[in-house]
């Protein structure tokens, strides 16, 4: 309970930092925010390093490590996702909800609709009656819970030590993507725990007397990964192939099964999307090759606009790099000191040449190498993306060897359970917390990106202020969905996800940045607009205030050098005949280019949302309720309950949760492919029918559940719920003021200019 109090304090500190940043105290707010994250991590690690650690305390600390940082990161805006990638996936999610079907085109991230696992799971929760944002939030928290609990369980199973699982989660928390990337609404957030669960199930199957149940769970998880994230599915298949090569005996055949399933599911789903995957990966590989060959280098501790990180952040990043390198080196030395002779010794002393531990260590040793590769622009992205996967074996080795090194092994006679005095423990926790902060800062980007504040150019969340949101809201209500629009990089995602428009950057050899860069508008620009079939043009005069924070205003390669837009370039549209002003407030204008002879083309989903009749909803609910209720009432129930009980005994709660997430994802995708749309009415009818068919069993389950409730803990939790709810209420009120009330004031401002566009027929 004390740990939860500290976690609540950390969340309150983060919300306080958000409020400070909004009041132009960004420097102090950044320090306060980091202190909050340090408290969240250190308090959990303090519990994990207790001399006497119970499983309940370990589980509480592990859950806090997974949930609290994610909530703290999103506390900057609880009402909307402000990440660039998150808005891309929100477009895919809203297309599914609007069209009731899969695979509607995404204008910015074409591969997203082809891997709809995350969105399908969110849709299934939304169909129960949850609002869209609440359903998305539930998915994120479930994924975070599955990630840390599956990792903890896997390490405990491999090491046989309760503490090792918790230490492994703490070690994984220092990865750069743990706080930011793997807690956002993006497909890797779901795919990563599913992949880890599949690997863990296969690890258990190696020594199981009846591995079929575990194979089934691994198959469900691997298929869930295959339909959720292309990169994770490919990397999982590659890892399982390598694992098969280094395994021996009967275990090799069991791991081989997982490798075959991973390869088959990944390739089967990817073959359909091959052209999109080429478009996705091709530019990345070309960009990396040009940077490595052309000598491009990034300036350390600076963003693309030249803004430098504070000194204390630089010191934390340097400490992180040194600590990570030293820790990897220590792992290598310690590992080789324990089992190196079996690898390098005489043949009679090494029955197997390649050990799985050596494979894991080899993967871990890539971390310092890729960290050094951050000197090139794409090197940072490669390290950040790969760290989510490479830190998994890192955490396993740290959990295994930290327990052996720090705590005496129980096999040794007359040994105390704890080797070091409390001062050493405190110093170790401080050093680990500093490393956690270094990873958090490295993965979350520049200091300005971690907290809200005044508008900045091409700065992701800092480019989504009330002025921008008001323009997007007006466009959603007044512009035809699917219409083509040009906008800067960040706001293109908002127009796509929130307004249903179709942002476009280039088409048939022409691009939209050329319309902005240049002092005049001539025949060439008019021809470009016609070729692009560009109906609307979005302009924010603040783009001329500075260079883009993340390297480009619109897209990579928009100009030959770091050219800054000027105010004249962004105001020239007012004097061009044929360009009509539709919206203006403050620095933002939206123009209609139809007067230039642009033939309108609408893309993506822009139809009416299909209606599901009440009869259909009742029929689906009745069929589902009868199927489940009669099954539970029949002789099939014990036949199904026995395998389920055995599965739970074999897999445990963490892997059961991950497998359930994968199964729900696949179930939702199948329903969408069959054009079956569930509704809250269908769920309510089905649940009511199950209760009516099985009243006695329902009452028994309720009584059994009530007897298992620990009412003292419920009372204590209720007391803590009040301050937790208060902190979230403050954060939500702050977000509502920016996202709702200020937006409405802008839309109602009498000095704003609003005009209705001319409606014309459009082709698709």
Regions found by a protein language model. Name each.
Residues 1-56, 596-711, 717, 732-735:
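Membrane-embedded, hydrophobic transmembrane alpha-helices
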Residues 4-7, 188, 400, 404-623, ...:
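Extracytoplasmic
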Residues 30-35, 181, 188, 234, ...:
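Hydrophobic/aromatic-rich transmembrane helices and adjacent perimembrane loops
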Residues 51, 56-61, 68-193, 389, ...:
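Active-site lumenal/periplasmic loops and adjacent helix-entry segments of GT-C-fold
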Residues 51, 208-212, 250-257, 329-365, ...:
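Membrane-interface helix-loop-helix junctions at transmembrane boundaries of multi-pass membrane enzymes
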Residues 59-67, 218, 239, 260-261, ...:
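Transmembrane alpha-helix segments characteristic
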Residues 63-70, 118, 122, 140-244, ...:
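Membrane-embedded helix bundles of polyisoprenyl
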Residues 85, 186-191, 213-216, 220-340, ...:
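Transmembrane catalytic cores of multi-pass membrane glycosyltransferases
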